[in-house]
Amino acid sequence: MAKLAGQLVEALDGLLGVPVPLRVQAWDGSVAGPPGAPTVVLRNRRALRRLVWQPNELGLARAYVAGDLELAPGTDLYETLSAVARFAERPEIRTMALGPRDVIGPRGRKALGAVLRAGALGPEPTPPPEEVRRAQGRLHSRSRDRAAISHHYDVGNEFYGLVLGSSMVYSCAYWTPEAKSLEAAQEAKLDLICRKLGLRPGMRLLDVGCGWGSLLLHAAKHYGVTAVGVSISKEQVALARARVEEAGLADRVEVRLQDYREIADGPFDAISSVGMAEHVGSEQYRVYAEGLYRLLVPGGRLLNHQIARRPDIPGEPHRTSSFIDRYVFPDGELSPVGSTVARLEEAGFEVRDVESLREHYGLTLREWVANLEAHWTEAVRLVGRGRARVWRLYMAASALAFEQNRIGVNQVLAVRSTEEGSAGLPPTREEWLVRPAAGVPAATPVVTAAETDLGDSRSVR
């Protein structure tokens, strides 16, 4: 047993065909692997058994969330995840799809021998309770979407407050030179959205996926609009309504527990969708885009703030993160920004501006991780150690993904032009960022429920 770690590292290197960029400390205290590399600790045989049954990202995630795998004292989380990400992007690893048969088959003979000597062969361990087992219902039906949103957003408003800070904004901040704190950077982002939308007193704003109401409050306080926000998270809606009441804005801000496909009281002068479209899904994106187009007045603007993935590599299958789908955002789907622009224009919008905020999201996520770590004991009390570990892992890994250009985030400004073709924007970008467009768009008749309820029908791609 004294050489257990060495046997495991040798077996793993043989199975993968290339050296793994990590040191491994086994439960017997032995350590092996490249000197100076980040060190992971297999605390028990169950950790190894999880990796035998799922020799991939999901197996590592399950072991970490369950507490069977740890980082050695002094090992940096970001350094470890960065090493793993670089390794996973190697062509010979990126195209590899390992399963338990590879471990017990001829290719994994050394690995199987090491597992047997370690006494770790046995039934597959039960996944941690934080994992989503099997989603019920048709993909992106209203009931399945409600369950997916509840899994992530209904973990407790107090927990979100620890992570997000007082702004209660769950999307990337805007780190201007003047923004010296997370709260200031989030306020700068909210104001950027309001300026891009050209908000001014008397306008009617719809915020799709309004979260805890921060954008609604900012727009009503500083731009004089009346606003409607919708979310299908019960806990978000409850806190957003309380914040609206506390701010004395209940006469101008309404927060609804409502699916975006059920909004039936347009038109709106402006629509914002910030960090919500990732939950729509590719098959429903046309329904989403066409629905927002119908709810907007001619001359009105849409601000669609959305995370984007890189385009698929030609000749390779599309890959999704099993950890993110099982633990973080069930049924979430990312699309390349070009696909988002095309879908919006197919729905009738004219896209006028696309701004990448990729680096801003990396900075924001690092702030959230720091908040979580600073309040770790309280976070564990609120949501349990396993879920707190999920959040630490997902946010740190996401920060690196943005920083290393594996994913991005974009604000897409689109307009519903008038019949005459007017977009209602000043002639230069600089102008419409600092002041609203002149004139008030003509009101359009209120759309009836029968015309707007979009249902659960599958759209044609």
Segments predicted by a language model, with ranges:
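Feature captures hydrophobic
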Residues: 1-180, 185-186, 192
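Conserved class I S-adenosyl-L-methionine
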Residues: 201-209
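Conserved SAM-binding loop of SAM-dependent methyltransferases across substrates and taxa
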Residues: 212-223
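Conserved SAM-binding loop
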Residues: 240-241
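A short acidic, Gly/Pro-enriched loop at the edge of an enzyme's catalytic core
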Residues: 261-271
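A short glycine-rich, Lys/Arg-flanked "PGG" loop and its adjoining helix->strand segment in the class I
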Residues: 286-298
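Conserved beta-strand signature within the Rossmann-like core of class I S-adenosyl-L-methionine
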Residues: 299-307
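Substrate-binding/catalytic lobe of Class I Rossmann-like enzymes that use SAM or dcSAM, i.e.
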Residues: 307-422, 432
